[in-house]
Amino acid sequence: MKHETHAKLARLRAAVGREYGKLVQKLLAIAFLETEVQKLVERSTQGIDLEMEIAGERCVFEVKTSESDSVRLTPKDLEGLDRLVEDGARVYLAVLTNAPFDDWILARYVPGEFPTGKNLTSFPFRAHRDRDLEQRIFTAFDRVVDRDVHTAITRRQGGLDGVLQGYPAWGRA
């Protein structure tokens, strides 16, 4: 991630407080749409955070962001992810912490591999990362943040929903 992108995310974090995670999730959804995924659904409230079709496969993402250098997985998170694996989906954890030089980690979820109730740095997720998928969004995410961070700061979730509506592959749950 470019230094400028980190700086813009820091501005976003300072401006919106607790809404930061949901806004970054929407920015990630927009970045995926920029890479021409199919049938992307973004959920801001309950259930799967992002669900999309990539190369004909159903892929689901639990998005974890943090204002610190770690994230926390809850038992509820893992139970839901376990069910999705059983249903045959490709399941990922999309992790972005606020540690210096951190970038998105898109880690394939493997049941039993991640502890709950602990603060986890990005390190444990690295063993399961999908580098091809990460490469797919890196440039797009920088571009999306550059273009849409002002909308996120000034118009919040409703503003980013307006951006999402401009993509034919987007759908709301």
Language-model regions, residue ranges each:
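Beta-rich catalytic cores
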Residues: 46
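Acidic-basic catalytic patches of nuclease active cores, encompassing PD-(D/E)XK
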Residues: 1-42
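Active-site-adjacent loop/helix micro-motif of nuclease/hydrolase catalytic cores
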Residues: 41-42, 67-79
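Non-catalytic C-terminal interaction segments of nucleic acid-processing enzymes
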Residues: 4, 31-34, 38, 98-100, ...
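Short amphipathic alpha-helical segments and helix-helix/interface helices
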Residues: 29, 78-82
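Conserved catalytic cores of phosphodiester-cleaving nucleases, focusing on short active-site segments
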Residues: 50-67
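Alpha-helix C-cap/termination motif
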Residues: 35, 53, 84-88
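Nucleic-acid nuclease catalytic cores
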Residues: 85-112
